[in-house]
Amino acid sequence: MLRRQARERREYLYRKAQELQETQLQQKRQIIKQALAQGKPLPKELAEDEQLQKDFRYDQSMADNEDEAGVDDEYSASSGIVEARVIVTTSRDPSSRLAQFAKEIKLLFPNAVRLNRGNYVMADLVSACKKSGTTDLIVLHEHRGVPTSLTVSHFPYGPTAFFSLHNVVLRHDILNRGNQSEVNPHLIFDNFTTPLGNRVVTILKNLFPPGPKKDSSRVITFANRGDFISVRQHVYVRTKDGVEMAEVGPRFEMRLFELRLGTLENKDADVEWQLRRFVRTANRKDYL
C-alpha cells in the first residue's frame, strides 16, 4: 500500500513538473509573439535565448488565447462533479476562542465536519483523511487565543495553501447578526486577476458543493484587496422595496503566504509560490 502511494506520488509530481515546464515555455513564446506584434524589444533573458527564438519559427502551437496553466490538474477529475468532504481541526490544546472559531468555520462550509485534534500526529491525521475519502483538510492555528493562520490541504496529492489570518471577528461579536444558514451558498470572488489568484479561487471554490443554488439566500464573498482576502458571509431577504442583507459572520481577512504542491504532512513537497518579505517590492506588488 505504501509503495503504491509512493509510486503514484512520484508519477504525479513528474507529470506536474512536465506541465509546469511546458507552461513556462508557452509563456515565453507568448511574450515573443506579443513583442513581435507590437514592435517592442524582447526582455534580456529571452533575447539571449537563441534556441527559444530558433524553435519559435517552427512552433505551431501558438494560439490567440493562452492555454490554461495546467496547474489545477488536482481538481480536474472532481471539480463540479464530486461534493467536497471537508474536515476542520485545530492545533493541539486549542483555546476556547480557537475552538469557537473552528465551529464557525465548520458552519461556513457545507458538508464540513469538525474534528477535535486530541493527540493526533499530522501524518496519522492525513492518512485517516485519505482513507475516509476526505477531499480537504482545514487546520487552524492561534497565538495567545487569537487565530493566526488557516491551512487548506487537498487530497490525495495536494496542493496545500497556507494563509495568515487578520482582524478575526467571531459571530457573537457582530451586532445585529443574522441567523446562521446551512444551505449551499452563492459564492462571489472579486478582483482575482493573476494566474496565482485564479489558483487560489480554484482551491477555495472546491471547498463548497457544486451545482446551482437558485433558492439559496446565503452569500459568501471572497474579495481581494491588496492581496488580503476579505471573507464575509451574508443572508438576504427579498422585500417589496428590494433586498435586505444581514451579516452572519465570522468576519476575517486572510493572506496567502505559501503554496505547496504536496499534502500537509509532506515537508519535502515542492514550493509552488512563497511570499518573500525580504524582496524590496514585496509590500508594493500585488500577487493575486
UniProtKB/Swiss-Prot annotation:
Gene3D superfamilies, per the entry? Probable brix-domain ribosomal biogenesis protein
The GO terms this record gives for MF are: RNA folding chaperone; rRNA primary transcript binding; single-stranded telomeric DNA binding; snoRNA binding
Q: What cellular-component terms does GO give this entry?
A: Mpp10 complex; small-subunit processome
Which keywords accompany this UniProt record?
Answer: Nucleus, Ribonucleoprotein, Ribosome biogenesis, rRNA processing
Look up keyword Nucleus and say if it applies.
yes
Domain (Brix) spans 84-265
BP GO terms, sorted: ribosomal small subunit biogenesis; rRNA processing
Source superkingdom: Eukaryota
Task: Tell me where in or outside the cell this protein is found.
Answer: Nucleus, Nucleolus
* Matches recorded under SUPFAM superfamilies: Class II aaRS ABD-related (SSF52954)
Q: Quote the subunit structure annotation.
A: Component of a heterotrimeric complex containing IMP3, IMP4 and MPP10.
What does this gene product do?
Component of the U3 small nucleolar ribonucleoprotein. Required for the early cleavages at sites A0, A1 and A2 during 18S ribosomal pre-RNA processing.
Q: What is this protein called?
A: U3 small nucleolar ribonucleoprotein protein IMP4
Task: Identify the species of origin.
Answer: Candida glabrata (strain ATCC 2001 / BCRC 20586 / JCM 3761 / NBRC 0622 / NRRL Y-65 / CBS 138)
What are the top taxonomic ranks of the organism? Answer: Eukaryota, Fungi, Dikarya, Ascomycota, Saccharomycotina
Q: Encoded by which gene? A: IMP4
